[in-house]
Amino acid sequence: MGEKRKTRQAEVNIGMVGHVDHGKTTLTKALTGVWTDTHSEELRRGITIKIGFADAEIRRCSNCGRYSTSPICPYCGHETEFIRRVSFIDSPGHEALMTTMLAGASLMDGAILVIAANEPCPRPQTREHLMALQIIGQKNIIIAQNKIELVDKEKALENYRQIKEFIKGTVAENAPIIPISALHGANIDVLVKAIEEFIPTPKRDSNKPPKMLVLRSFDVNKPGTPPEKLVGGVLGGSIVQGKLKVGDEIEIRPGVPYEEHGRIKYEPITTEIVSLQAGGQFVEEAYPGGLVGIGTKLDPYLTKGDLMAGNVVGKPGKLPPVWTDLRLEVHLLERVVGTEQELNVEPIKRKEVLLLNVGTARTMGLVTALGKDEIELKLQIPVCAEPGERVAISRQIGSRWRLIGYGIIKE
């Protein structure tokens, strides 16, 4: 058991989504013991800016049968049995950070929509995050009605009715609604049981060519490190298919920017995996699920400060195409989501600049042609993606980018 435990990798990614300050990070801490806001600005402002990952083990008590994430049952003190390891992706709920949430959404196998019981439902980002889940086609959703310690029974029931009304006709229509207090750990066992029942581990084919979406990239060298001690750049993200091994040669697309005749172009790069980290451990092989860190031979200058975020990693010659222009079959929403007042979505116009989220990448696209339910765009930064993939489309309204629909990449 001890040996197996050492190398356990999370097998499913669960997004924590919802309006700013409704308790996503507190709930992640209640489930995992990890406070995911570690960015200095996050601690100062009390909101999540970057995407945080934290793992937890889903366990069941062999004595009382209750679920928890702890080796010893918090309810009766007996040992618990390991079921599976899951990874929580804590997304920003602040409206200015919606595009960051969409990048994380592309890695989610399920989601917990956190809704505070002490505020009217829905709040703007509650609506926006649910729409984001709908756009990416995510149906494995649980609703955590949080902060029930702040309201009386009547208020909690009124809020429950508002939630039921809000989810009618959406992908979350049949989602279980679980009242909890993340702060006091109340009803967390019921939530963990719901995760086990409603967010299954997807069937994955490890024989497919590996593909990893890069969410973060780092230079882990401290200033003043002597040259012989420098280590290569690190890529952080999630494997969506296949597996990666230490020693593998990998290609990164669209790669790194360079200038040619005054224009910025991108060139794919190849490197070797020198180390792999999953679940906080160094491993020889990594699979889909959880955050994976790849140590490479890349110049750390290329990976510092998330410069490689939005790239796709795989075996050389096996990755999807890189697009500098996209043709999309467009599906627009009726109304703009995320704004306090309801606005109708205007049709897309020629020469309009839209923000596109493609996997973990985001890029601006200039609309060059319009057809019936189709548009063509010239991209500011190229993207690596499969034909048929979904792309979230946002438009600038006022000073913010607002989700207005999605597109499907056409050949």
Curated annotation (Swiss-Prot):
Region (G4): 146-149
Necessary cofactors: Mg(2+)
Upper classification of the organism: Archaea, Methanobacteriati, Methanobacteriota, Thermococci, Thermococcales
Region (G1): 18-25
Family matches, as Gene3D superfamilies: P-loop containing nucleotide triphosphate hydrolases, Translation factors
Catalyzed chemical reaction(s): GTP + H2O = GDP + phosphate + H(+)
Residues binding Zn(2+), per UniProt: C61, C64, C73, C76
Signal peptide coordinates: none
Disulfide-bond pairs as recorded: none
PANTHER family assigned to the protein according to its UniProt record, in alphabetical order: EUKARYOTIC TRANSLATION INITIATION FACTOR 2 SUBUNIT 3 FAMILY MEMBER (PTHR42854), EUKARYOTIC TRANSLATION INITIATION FACTOR 2 SUBUNIT 3-RELATED (PTHR42854:SF3)
The protein's name in its UniProt record: Translation initiation factor 2 subunit gamma
HAMAP family: eIF_2_gamma (MF_00119)
Region entry G5, spans: 181-183
Function description: eIF-2 functions in the early steps of protein synthesis by forming a ternary complex with GTP and initiator tRNA.
Residue span of region G2: 46-50
Organism: Pyrococcus furiosus (strain ATCC 43587 / DSM 3638 / JCM 8422 / Vc1)
Binding positions for GTP per the UniProt entry: D21, H22, G23, K24, T25, T26, N146, K147, I148, E149, S181, A182, L183
